[in-house]
């Protein structure tokens, strides 16, 4: 196998649940996956690791570097021989617009490593090595199973409340339930001319507004 496509679908996140830092658990969330817009990651075996984001509004250089470091850590951990060039495409699914595209990309990149190297793996292997899922489990659970996901967040060990872009915690969100959503027609309006926030703005928002 020399190349693979991994198609992933966005999630709508209804809410984070526990943001007070006073209970036994923090974060937690509810949301569901939707069938469009599609994100396509095309992986082709290569002599060097390359990540090419061809979307109209791509990841920043800092974000691409962070993704590359995550992939390289996984390569080193498992002593993998097959590396790839990854080309990311989507017509309307851009970073930091509320659909979990970065989580989708990270999970896809780790899963592609396992597939192209012929490794047996579990969902936990993908999540742990992706460093995602540190805030809500909606993105990681819907990546694998679609549908609706409700999770209870993580144990409160008095860590900083933060977005998943700051890396995974020592454990990741416990799913309370997951089930297939009704086949509702959902309309989404994406204002093209309104710039999305940056990763740093997202981090700053959490620091300025939590705990609640």
Annotate each PLM feature.
Residues 1-97, 101, 111-123, 134, ...:
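ATP-binding N-lobe of GHMP and related small-molecule kinases
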Residues 2-7, 15-17, 21-29, 122-212:
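ATP-dependent small-molecule kinase catalytic core of the GHMP/sugar-kinase superfamily
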């Amino acid at each position: 196998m020399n190349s693979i496509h991994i198609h992933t679908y966005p999630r709508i996140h209804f809410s984070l649940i526990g943001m007070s830092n006073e209970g036994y658990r923090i974060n937690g969330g509810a949301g569901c996956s939707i069938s469009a817009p599609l994100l396509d990651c095309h992986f082709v075996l290569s002599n060097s690791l390359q990540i090419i984001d061809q979307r109209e509004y791509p990841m920043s250089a800092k974000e691409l570097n962070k993704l590359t470091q995550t992939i390289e850590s996984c390569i080193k951990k498992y002593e993998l021989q097959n590396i790839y060039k990854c080309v990311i495409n989507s017509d309307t699914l851009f970073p930091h617009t509320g659909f979990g595209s970065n989580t989708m990309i990270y999970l896809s990149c780790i899963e592609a490593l396992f597939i192209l190297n012929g490794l047996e793996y579990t969902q936990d292997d993908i999540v742990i090595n992706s460093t995602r899922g540190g805030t809500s489990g909606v993105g990681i659970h819907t990546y694998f199973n679609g549908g609706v996901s409700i999770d209870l967040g993580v144990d409160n060990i008095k860590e900083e409340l933060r977005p998943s872009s700051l890396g995974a915690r020592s454990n990741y969100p416990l799913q309370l339930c997951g089930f297939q959503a009704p086949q509702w027609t959902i309309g989404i309006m994406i204002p093209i001319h309104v710039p999305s926030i940056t990763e740093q703005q997202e981090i700053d928002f959490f620091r300025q507004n939590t705990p609640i």
